């Protein structure tokens, strides 16, 4: 067969470009209405991709909010996006239209790691029967294995004891706390998933944590966004393996852990953990092609719970200790409350929380100020809705700017300062604000919120009960400005943990 010459290819290329431009134009004309949210003028085909600051998206979105208002639109290639800002817009979209905004936009690069119609996990699953089935299963299994009961609290308290022992091993010398916090929180998730914990020096455990962090970094930023809006690029030979090498290794390691766990599973015995409970559901679902209980989805659910349950809580605790060394006055008040309510012998319990308003306020203020997931997880509309007078068509991706609520100067007295009094009334009682929504809101609010609250309170109080934290002598005062990435993390810092 004769190959076309260069002169023959030019008309084909020109026709293809014109065709793409026409498709792009027709796609956008559907949204050209006075009721559609305004936004920056997009470029042909690429849309606003090159106009977004992927290094600091919250700051970039704040500038666009000042220019266009609480709702503004973006075009990411052929994907229409609306960014929601401010409490009224977020509550209207996520609560009033809870079911209509509960869908997720597809992440095409996930298809290469076992993510598919019958294996969507929980966090990123499309809204429908499979998501309902998995969320219901996860919530009921968490409850069965102790969420809200004494058993899980004992797991967390025991892990807090191990964490304190690891802090004590540094003998008051400077160290970075984030790795130990990662290990402690990850062990709580491992207890729920595999009914076991890892030793902190276990090489396999260390590799699991490294791969988990690599996966999160690989899935954030400009390149993953580009691959998602132009999925045809995913077919370039070798590209996926290079861009998502950490994710590929992480999934392979999860497969190893699950294979080992299946060998020890006895269907005749009560389930030891979430994995056993899932395997039992897989057996029940055999012969049902519509069920979301299958081996591929087990891997995705486990990955979801590791990533959503570990990194967010450990990052929040890393911020909490940073604020304690930056604000020794706050640290002193927390320790005073611990001494009065718990003492220095008995271990903290969740029952203590109701009698510790200042400590509770500090934890909430850490979550508000740290703002670790400023843009939440994207939603997608399943039908036309109207928010703040603007029409948002079916199939539009929604970016939920949680930072616009957590740092709203019309709600918080000192939005850009660490100020625990945001959560205290004039009498010193704890009060919770409607604008406090680090776990999002509505139908897709974080299912691990109760577990995260338990971990934050027990780990934080156990550490402050045992140690006083300070900036190492001779080191500069750390910054309280975060680094935006998959999560907003503190800049690297060290502290000294002195036994009390």
Swiss-Prot record:
Compartments where found: Endoplasmic reticulum membrane; Microsome membrane
InterPro entries: Cyt_P450, Cyt_P450_CS, Cyt_P450_E_grp-I, Cyt_P450_E_grp-I_CYP2D-like, Cyt_P450_sf, Cytochrome_P450_fam2
Free-text tissue specificity from the UniProt record: Brain.
Catalytic reaction list: an organic molecule + reduced [NADPH--hemoprotein reductase] + O2 = an alcohol + oxidized [NADPH--hemoprotein reductase] + H2O + H(+)
Cofactor: heme
Pfam families the UniProt entry points to: p450
Gene Ontology, cellular component aspect: cytoplasm; endoplasmic reticulum membrane; intracellular membrane-bounded organelle; mitochondrion
Keywords assigned: Endoplasmic reticulum, Heme, Iron, Membrane, Metal-binding, Microsome, Monooxygenase, Oxidoreductase
GO biological process annotation, one example: female pregnancy
Protein name: Cytochrome P450 2D4
List of residues binding heme: 446
Source organism (scientific name): Rattus norvegicus (Rat)
Enzyme Commission number: 1.14.14.1
Principal location: endoplasmic reticulum
Entry keyword Endoplasmic reticulum: yes
Membrane topology type: Peripheral membrane protein
GO MF annotations, alphabetized: anandamide 11,12 epoxidase activity; anandamide 14,15 epoxidase activity; anandamide 8,9 epoxidase activity; arachidonate monooxygenase activity; heme binding; iron ion binding; monooxygenase activity; oxidoreductase activity
